[in-house]
């Protein structure tokens, strides 16, 4: 497997709709206000995706048990805003602004941005498999004993694109993966 460079990412985004909307280059300042942003957009060997304005913040209001086989959404509070406050030692789910369409010979890995990591916020996103498409559901954990703020429409994680040496026998789309074409924040289900 080899990692793909900015020229390839740009070509695939513009000619094949691999990333929509696509920011051609790193955006780190709001063009209207001049305010500094946590960067997003095309980088040398990846693409920094953004958080949308929709969040689900974990809460234990109902004294629930977290069970991935029998998950209930009442463990979350839904928020739509430009920022989200994650309680201490808790987490939030969000989704990307960008919609991704992954080619059959590509697998991605997603790594949290250092700006958030240095604040004790850990981003977890599973790989985008060959021929997966959709908005990315993103998990952000606050490992600190203090509340933490995350920002909508700013960078949260970098997607790295790896080209396989050989084509896979069965793609995510062909095996009818359960998170194919997900819209918005998708909670776990079996």
UniProtKB/Swiss-Prot annotation:
<dbReference type="GO" id="GO:0015949">
    <property type="term" value="P:nucleobase-containing small molecule interconversion"/>
</dbReference>
<feature type="active site" description="Proton donor/acceptor">
    <location>
        <position position="139"/>
    </location>
</feature>
<dbReference type="InterPro" id="IPR033704">
    <property type="entry name" value="dUTPase_trimeric"/>
</dbReference>
<protein>
    <recommendedName>
        <fullName>dCTP deaminase</fullName>
        <ecNumber>3.5.4.13</ecNumber>
    </recommendedName>
</protein>
<feature type="binding site">
    <location>
        <position position="158"/>
    </location>
    <ligand>
        <name>dCTP</name>
    </ligand>
</feature>
<dbReference type="GO" id="GO:0006229">
    <property type="term" value="P:dUTP biosynthetic process"/>
</dbReference>
<dbReference type="GO" id="GO:0008829">
    <property type="term" value="F:dCTP deaminase activity"/>
</dbReference>
<comment type="function">
    <text>Catalyzes the deamination of dCTP to dUTP.</text>
</comment>
<comment type="subunit">
    <text>Homotrimer.</text>
</comment>
<keyword id="KW-0547">Nucleotide-binding</keyword>
<comment type="pathway">
    <text>Pyrimidine metabolism; dUMP biosynthesis; dUMP from dCTP (dUTP route): step 1/2.</text>
</comment>
<feature type="binding site">
    <location>
        <position position="181"/>
    </location>
    <ligand>
        <name>dCTP</name>
    </ligand>
</feature>
<dbReference type="InterPro" id="IPR011962">
    <property type="entry name" value="dCTP_deaminase"/>
</dbReference>
<keyword id="KW-0546">Nucleotide metabolism</keyword>
<comment type="similarity">
    <text>Belongs to the dCTP deaminase family.</text>
</comment>
<keyword id="KW-0378">Hydrolase</keyword>
<dbReference type="GO" id="GO:0006226">
    <property type="term" value="P:dUMP biosynthetic process"/>
</dbReference>
<feature type="binding site">
    <location>
        <begin position="113"/>
        <end position="118"/>
    </location>
    <ligand>
        <name>dCTP</name>
    </ligand>
</feature>
<dbReference type="GO" id="GO:0000166">
    <property type="term" value="F:nucleotide binding"/>
</dbReference>
<feature type="binding site">
    <location>
        <position position="172"/>
    </location>
    <ligand>
        <name>dCTP</name>
    </ligand>
</feature>
<feature type="binding site">
    <location>
        <position position="182"/>
    </location>
    <ligand>
        <name>dCTP</name>
    </ligand>
</feature>
<dbReference type="Pfam" id="PF22769">
    <property type="entry name" value="DCD"/>
</dbReference>
<dbReference type="InterPro" id="IPR036157">
    <property type="entry name" value="dUTPase-like_sf"/>
</dbReference>
